[in-house]
Amino acid sequence: MKQRGVTIWLTGLSGAGKSTITEALAQKLREQDYPLEVLDGDVVRTNLTKGLGFSKEDRDENIRRIGFVCNLLTRHGVFVLVSAISPYREIREEVRGKIGDFVEVFVNAPLAVCEQRDVKGLYKRARAGEIKSFTGIDDPYEPPLNPEVECRTDLEELDESVNKILHKLDQLGYLR
């Protein structure tokens, strides 16, 4: 029987822990020989969506393009892990509808915690007015209303977050 693909979409503020969880989850899935690709928001912006800015329209287009790639890979039995802020609910729902096999993971941490974790100094620069339209500061983040999984990275350990996602994937029939 052919492996069923799925897009696992991690959304949340910058610094919430999306990339950290994605890396740990990818390692666990690779250990079990699942076909896997990771699409990290920063890497995608450098390669696939270079030239797009941070207006709502450009952010939506960025997510649409990521979703297009996810759809191609997912229907060929690949587990696609997306780590992207993807701040707007409507475009996340649009992408979910196109892909079908889609598990939304809300990586949730309070803004203050995200700012404490900010190794790149982006929040500091946004608060100083050096970065405009920064999600969580002067641009909104719309949390998912009904994510399949919510990871509270300010309250739980990394392993707990990863295991919650694996449990949900198993419940939904994606794991063999």
Curated annotation (Swiss-Prot):
Pathway: Sulfur metabolism; hydrogen sulfide biosynthesis; sulfite from sulfate: step 2/3
Catalytic activity of the protein: adenosine 5'-phosphosulfate + ATP = 3'-phosphoadenylyl sulfate + ADP + H(+)
E.C. number: 2.7.1.25
Residues involved in ATP binding: G12, L13, S14, G15, A16, G17, K18, S19
The keyword Disulfide bond is assigned to this record: no
Pfam families for the chain: APS_kinase (PF01583)
Example GO biological process: sulfate assimilation, phosphoadenylyl sulfate reduction by phosphoadenylyl-sulfate reductase (thioredoxin)
Coiled-coil portions: none
Molecular function GO terms recorded: adenylylsulfate kinase activity; ATP binding; sulfate adenylyltransferase (ATP) activity
CDD domains noted in UniProt: APSK
GO cellular component: cytoplasm
Entries under PANTHER family matching the protein: SULFATE ADENYLYLTRANSFERASE
NCBIfam families assigned: apsK, PRK00889.1, PRK03846.1
Similarity annotation: Belongs to the APS kinase family.
Protein name, as recorded: Adenylyl-sulfate kinase
Organism from which the protein derives: Gloeothece citriformis (strain PCC 7424) (Cyanothece sp. (strain PCC 7424))
Upper taxonomic lineage: Bacteria, Bacillati, Cyanobacteriota, Cyanophyceae, Oscillatoriophycideae
Gene that encodes it: cysC
